[in-house]
């Protein structure tokens, strides 16, 4: 049903276990048409060096009919919404996900988290906000959903938040999906795979979409073209190899 996965990690994030080649093979096996590698931003303790991201230019754009986007899951670093992806590194990215991670920015309170996320959205560097349903970072969800819709930023439903990580996220994720629906915004589905076997697994996300009657035309992952058009509207450069996708 969904042919794009926009959130996964390779062995370059050393708590993950698969290579780019592993993900390509799994994408072919699962019938995915496009995916983004989004290793953790460099302020995480086991994240890749900035050169890892700047050298993604050596990657092929397509392998065996599957498209590859060059991305990052950046860390929100402060109340002002700055992230650990900027300058040349930011310029090399096709897609930027950004979110809260405890080793970089410890939880504070609802007002702090909301202000930081609103600032991140307004700054324009992040295309997608990762796992905003994390209960350790309570938010003013309607305010975040409205801001994301206004700025053309997608909020993520993260499949791993229902299973491997961030216990207690489910109710928040339902609330987020409903708030994005009401605000007329975009949802992005992310497997958040740390091993290739989880790539493209959106089973929990799909259940939430159905529960809140989320409009399918506002889910990015439906097609490569929808994702590429979204990124171009956000000012990302056109990728010539995907012009006819």
Curated annotation (Swiss-Prot):
- Give the UniProt record's GO annotations in the biological process aspect: bacterial-type flagellum-dependent swarming motility
Can you quote a single GO CC term? cytosol
What note does UniProt attach to the cofactor annotation?
A: Binds 3 Zn(2+) ions per subunit.
Please tell me where Zn(2+) 3 binds in this chain. Answer: 73, 101, 131
EC assignment:
3.1.3.-
Which HAMAP family does the entry link to? Answer: YcdX_phosphat
Subunit relationships: Homotrimer.
The family line of this record is: Belongs to the PHP family.
Q: What is this protein called?
A: Probable phosphatase NT01EI_1577
Organism encoding this protein: Edwardsiella ictaluri (strain 93-146)
